[in-house]
Amino acid sequence: MSDVEKVDGECSASGKRERLTLKLGDKLKVPPSLARGTSTGKSFTTVEVRSKKRRPGEYISHDDKRRSGLNKAVSGLTAQEQLFRINAINMADSISAKEKELAAARKAKEEEELAAAAAVVEEAVEEVSVEGDVPPVEAVEAAVPDVEEVVAPVATPSHSNKSGHDDRGGKKYAHGATGRHKEKEGVSIKKVASSRGASKHIKLDIENALSGLEDKRVTRFSSSTHKRRSSNVKSGRRISREVVISDKMTVRDLALAMAEKAQDVLRMLSHVGVEARMDTGLDSEVACEIAVEFGHRPRVVSIVKMEQELSDVCGDDFVSEPRPPVVTVMGHVDHGKTSLLDVLRKSNVAEKEFRGITQHIGAYQIDVDGKKITFLDTPGHEAFADMRARGANVTDIVVLVVAADDGIMPQTVESINHVKAAGVAMVVAVNKIDKSDADVGRITNELLQYGVIAEELGGDVMIVPVSAKTGENIDKLQSAILLLAEMLELSAPRECRAQGVVIEAKIDRGCGVVATVIVQKGTLKKGDIIVAGDSSYGKVRSMFDDADRVVTSALPAMPVRVLGLNAIPKAGDTLIVMPSEKQARDLLWHRSEINSAREENRAVPSFSGAIMASMDSKVEEINLILKADVAGSMEAVSCAVEQLVHEEVKFNVLHKEMGDVTKSDVLLAEVSSAVILAFNVRVDAKARDLLRLKKVDVRHYQVIYDLVDDVRNMVSGKLKPIVQEMQVGLLTVRQMFSSGKSGTVLGCYVTEGAVTRGATVCVCRGETVIGEGTVKALRRFKEDVKEVNRGLECGLLVDGVKGVLAGDVIKVLEIVERMRGVE
């Protein structure tokens, strides 16, 4: 039987691997094909590993001549060691082949880079020769004095250099041809062998040459694109540009405006005698001087003027087109404003409001006979005065709703004043004419004293009697609005950048910041960069109309809900579309500078005056945290709190924000002993779990009336009560008795009320007060009693009063504390 037994048979043509089993023997005999590493389709398994020490000096050679004598060389090794040797030989062969491939690839890449670099240098040489300042050879040598390169024209073909060798760690590596000649129009570059062994760094040398040429400002090249870039920058010259200098400009801002390094600007400032840092504000004169030193043309523009230039969305080049009217419905609370609007837009918003009272400003657009009308519904409570004023300022026509049964009310008068201040047209809708006590004539006469004269009385105000309940005369009201809008000839440009007014703003859980906007000019599109107010900007991610339909653009007078702002704007802020995000940030920066300048101009009380005021005043403080659903509601809540401030009670609003009550709100309220006023918002899950452990007062409201009453009660609870002395009894002294050590007992008759033991009494003789004291003992006959009523006689022992005579009058007093109210 042979030493090697086939187990799995012959290797198939498909390339299946044969398995060889090596049997026991004195020495392991390996087939020559396997020993030479040529058998790649076979695998073998050792049956037994025989341990035997290796003879000294035995090794496996890498040479093919020694590989044939493998059995003799490894006869002293174990079977496992011999297999390791064989595998190492095979792996070494594969690694050697891979190294050769990589070396060839590297060599080809180096040749390509060398050729490209040589081409760039040739272009540099040509450029220098064109300039005529320095000959080509001298220019390159002057740029790179330390590199041994020779640039010379040759007439013969280039020859490759001999290979160089370097011995590292006993191994030899072939460098190959490191220096080569590139022919182009009779010019070649030859690398001369360096004494420092830098023959393989020709690429670095060429890059240094290019850098030196760039320092001489001859031309600019790009080695990455292998193309020459022409430049206007020459030695000693800078690009001059117009630099806009504002009133307040920091060193960093000036450097950015000039496109210069901030360190260079600081160095120039130190040369002119100004010590500054990056955030130091510069005077406009100093900034202009620095700009001139850098060779620029300064132009001084005030911050206010710059803000106006940035916020100007359209000029005279845009043609105005007709637009729908914006109509605001105003009036006293519960006079039927929302119900009337529901009839106009054929909806039922009033029933969705809590108790039927509007708490937010709403924007809707309806279609009447093919013509659109935009309506704004405002709350009627006095706390929403700013909201109504805002509605009057953005509107074209005001529909003043007056209940026919109630007549003119305080918020009706306030709405009339807003209309007059805004200078807009007005239509009076006398609502609830379906009631039995309705009197339209009385309403017309009452309006006269406020300067509202009806058309039938010779004025210019249309008065339309309507009924939101039955729908009577609703068509006449619509016709009156359209007629007035036609007379006003309303128009606005559509092609310019959009501008609008923020009506409401809030934070939505799924959408982020949502702002309700009325577009006034231009067309607001999805993707526009917008700025709202002094701190909000962003990109319009999406828009929705009043019916929650997605829209991609909004024309003038169209109300939309805009998503994409980074912060909540204030209700009433102007929304502007900017050409770029950079200009949007610049506009916000200018507005912040204007606001900071206004803050600096305000009078600041002195430190000593503040200390004296705090020492003299003993004011009770109430810490509050305000939470509301929208910006308009937050404004109303803040207004209500400010109006209820008393001279003895002060509200400290620690934090106010739109959105639900959060965990941070609860923690802040705990450490500051604050009360959380939550208007139309809830408490989120994490804050709800925390409230079970913390003693924090969270008060929820859905109607502004309830919030105002509760805040008023909070103020009353902090005020010191009014102390009053009330007379509850009257006695007449008839006789005095001496009781020895106890004192004088007064025999009295109760003429009014009653007297009790321990009561406070005042002894009077005519109009003169003899003294005041306390009833120490009270007896009827010889029995101690607690109280003696009217018409009975009793004996009193009064502590603290002496010299009482018969006929004196004793008044029984009671100290009463009464809570103080807030108007």
From Swiss-Prot:
Biased composition (Basic and acidic residues): 56-66
Region (G1): 331-338
Location of the protein in the cell: Cytoplasm
Annotated region (G5), positions in chain: 467-469
Transmembrane annotation, as ranges: none
Location of region: G3: 377-380
Region G2: start-end pairs: 356-360
Residues annotated to bind GTP: 331-338, 377-381, 431-434
Stored HAMAP family: IF_2_B
NCBIfam families: IF-2 (TIGR00487), small_GTP (TIGR00231)
Name of this chain's protein: Translation initiation factor IF-2
Organism: Anaplasma phagocytophilum (strain HZ)
